[in-house]
Amino acid sequence: MKTIMLCAICSVTQGNCVEDCAYCTQSAKAGADITKFKEKSVQQVVDEAKMAYKNHALGFCLVTSGARLNDKKTDYIASLARAVHKEVPNLMLIACNGMATYEQLCELKNAGIFSYNHNLETSREYFPKICTTHSWDERYQTNLDAKRAGLMLCTGGIYGVGESEADRVSFRASLKELEPFSSPINFFIRSDALRLDQPPLSADEALKIVRETKSALPETRVMIAGGREKILGERQYEIFENGADAIVIGDYLTAKGEKASKDIEELTKRGFSFASICH
């Protein structure tokens, strides 16, 4: 019986991001019709954490919109982490808050954050094609600082944004340098609101990406996140035969995901168990 890790996302601030990431509907430049809000209440976040834990999630990720942390946002995330840790102590708390300083990351670590998620997204060479308002090097440095602060590292990216095979190889080589604890794979889903217009990946290509990622990062938990349901469809649970160790359950940031109950039912039927402790 294979044990897999489930992770849930909690979007605690959403929309109105001034960055121009071509794949992201939260960018104000995209003009996407999404729900926007500044800060969820502490109680709402705690309630979502309790539901995630009830649905067998081990990871619970506190996600903010925007390019980077500032002192106010850092204090907010730290307060959420303390509240969730008090009410649901067995959850592994992850923060995904953009670029950050070493000092800010230390504050999150001290508040009970276990892991920091900041994706490289793609290769250093291709990144300027999909984002011009900040650099790939800034992202890489945040990952280094997260490790230095004692946080476990969660970094991955998005496929199907027009990158070449050489870009994919370069991207995975950069991930390997960072030796992340976990690495999320997202598959791009086209939206009329986005300037990026790329055809969807085939299921075969998506599964090949999973295999190649696990081959490049054998000691890392490979997590399949955005696009799993739409790109893979009925073949989505084949990801585990191809090297995946974890999935995101429930909804994503601005997109609906599979119902957690359906994932749990299908995975249980296939003989999987769910990680309840992080090691």
UniProtKB/Swiss-Prot annotation:
<feature type="binding site">
    <location>
        <position position="21"/>
    </location>
    <ligand>
        <name>[4Fe-4S] cluster</name>
    </ligand>
</feature>
<dbReference type="GO" id="GO:0051537">
    <property type="term" value="F:2 iron, 2 sulfur cluster binding"/>
</dbReference>
<keyword id="KW-0093">Biotin biosynthesis</keyword>
<feature type="domain" description="Radical SAM core">
    <location>
        <begin position="2"/>
        <end position="228"/>
    </location>
</feature>
<dbReference type="InterPro" id="IPR013785">
    <property type="entry name" value="Aldolase_TIM"/>
</dbReference>
<dbReference type="GO" id="GO:0009102">
    <property type="term" value="P:biotin biosynthetic process"/>
</dbReference>
<keyword id="KW-0949">S-adenosyl-L-methionine</keyword>
<comment type="function">
    <text>Catalyzes the conversion of dethiobiotin (DTB) to biotin by the insertion of a sulfur atom into dethiobiotin via a radical-based mechanism.</text>
</comment>
<comment type="similarity">
    <text>Belongs to the radical SAM superfamily. Biotin synthase family.</text>
</comment>
<feature type="binding site">
    <location>
        <position position="221"/>
    </location>
    <ligand>
        <name>[2Fe-2S] cluster</name>
    </ligand>
</feature>
<dbReference type="GO" id="GO:0005506">
    <property type="term" value="F:iron ion binding"/>
</dbReference>
<feature type="binding site">
    <location>
        <position position="96"/>
    </location>
    <ligand>
        <name>[2Fe-2S] cluster</name>
    </ligand>
</feature>
<comment type="subunit">
    <text>Homodimer.</text>
</comment>
<comment type="pathway">
    <text>Cofactor biosynthesis; biotin biosynthesis; biotin from 7,8-diaminononanoate: step 2/2.</text>
</comment>
<dbReference type="InterPro" id="IPR024177">
    <property type="entry name" value="Biotin_synthase"/>
</dbReference>
<feature type="binding site">
    <location>
        <position position="61"/>
    </location>
    <ligand>
        <name>[2Fe-2S] cluster</name>
    </ligand>
</feature>
<dbReference type="InterPro" id="IPR002684">
    <property type="entry name" value="Biotin_synth/BioAB"/>
</dbReference>
<dbReference type="InterPro" id="IPR006638">
    <property type="entry name" value="Elp3/MiaA/NifB-like_rSAM"/>
</dbReference>
<keyword id="KW-0408">Iron</keyword>
<keyword id="KW-0479">Metal-binding</keyword>
<keyword id="KW-0808">Transferase</keyword>
<dbReference type="Pfam" id="PF06968">
    <property type="entry name" value="BATS"/>
</dbReference>
<feature type="binding site">
    <location>
        <position position="17"/>
    </location>
    <ligand>
        <name>[4Fe-4S] cluster</name>
    </ligand>
</feature>
<feature type="binding site">
    <location>
        <position position="24"/>
    </location>
    <ligand>
        <name>[4Fe-4S] cluster</name>
    </ligand>
</feature>
<keyword id="KW-0004">4Fe-4S</keyword>
<dbReference type="Pfam" id="PF04055">
    <property type="entry name" value="Radical_SAM"/>
</dbReference>
<dbReference type="GO" id="GO:0004076">
    <property type="term" value="F:biotin synthase activity"/>
</dbReference>
<dbReference type="InterPro" id="IPR010722">
    <property type="entry name" value="BATS_dom"/>
</dbReference>
<feature type="binding site">
    <location>
        <position position="154"/>
    </location>
    <ligand>
        <name>[2Fe-2S] cluster</name>
    </ligand>
</feature>
<keyword id="KW-0001">2Fe-2S</keyword>
<keyword id="KW-0411">Iron-sulfur</keyword>
<dbReference type="GO" id="GO:0051539">
    <property type="term" value="F:4 iron, 4 sulfur cluster binding"/>
</dbReference>
<protein>
    <recommendedName>
        <fullName>Biotin synthase</fullName>
        <ecNumber>2.8.1.6</ecNumber>
    </recommendedName>
</protein>
<dbReference type="InterPro" id="IPR007197">
    <property type="entry name" value="rSAM"/>
</dbReference>
